[in-house]
Amino acid sequence: MAKTFYVVVIVLCLGFIHQKAYGVYMQKLSDKKLCADDECIYAISFGRAEDDYNAPDCRFVNLKKGELVYIYTKLVKENDDAGEFWSGSVYSDQYRDQQGLVGYFPSSLVTELTVYKDELQELPTTAVDFYCD
């Protein structure tokens, strides 16, 4: 009985030690971001997609022309050659009471309709900001 107990404990311990991570850390799009608050959980603004956008990888979100978008962060453009990206989620009745899929998209594709917060906080980006599940 005691031998079985020790075998079970060892197997459980090995199971906790050997955990797999399925996410992928992708290249950072920027070193700084602008947010409405210090945790970047409140929306900066609300906008409308002016054109379709197909996400090139898991960091980005698909947009369809006319969709409404909540904007949560604005990445700080590092140089003139770099694109300017915002992160947000598409508004739909399905996600009325919860936040939908959040991802990046080019800022040139979305027109802000309502700005909730004018004074934004500049914060450093982290690897988690560009993490793909």
Swiss-Prot record:
<dbReference type="Pfam" id="PF07653">
    <property type="entry name" value="SH3_2"/>
</dbReference>
<feature type="disulfide bond">
    <location>
        <begin position="58"/>
        <end position="132"/>
    </location>
</feature>
<keyword id="KW-0964">Secreted</keyword>
<feature type="domain" description="SH3">
    <location>
        <begin position="42"/>
        <end position="115"/>
    </location>
</feature>
<feature type="disulfide bond">
    <location>
        <begin position="35"/>
        <end position="40"/>
    </location>
</feature>
<comment type="similarity">
    <text>Belongs to the MIA/OTOR family.</text>
</comment>
<keyword id="KW-0732">Signal</keyword>
<dbReference type="InterPro" id="IPR036028">
    <property type="entry name" value="SH3-like_dom_sf"/>
</dbReference>
<dbReference type="GO" id="GO:0001502">
    <property type="term" value="P:cartilage condensation"/>
</dbReference>
<feature type="signal peptide">
    <location>
        <begin position="1"/>
        <end position="23"/>
    </location>
</feature>
<dbReference type="InterPro" id="IPR001452">
    <property type="entry name" value="SH3_domain"/>
</dbReference>
<keyword id="KW-1015">Disulfide bond</keyword>
<protein>
    <recommendedName>
        <fullName>Otoraplin</fullName>
    </recommendedName>
</protein>
<dbReference type="InterPro" id="IPR042801">
    <property type="entry name" value="OTOR"/>
</dbReference>
<dbReference type="GO" id="GO:0005576">
    <property type="term" value="C:extracellular region"/>
</dbReference>
<keyword id="KW-0728">SH3 domain</keyword>
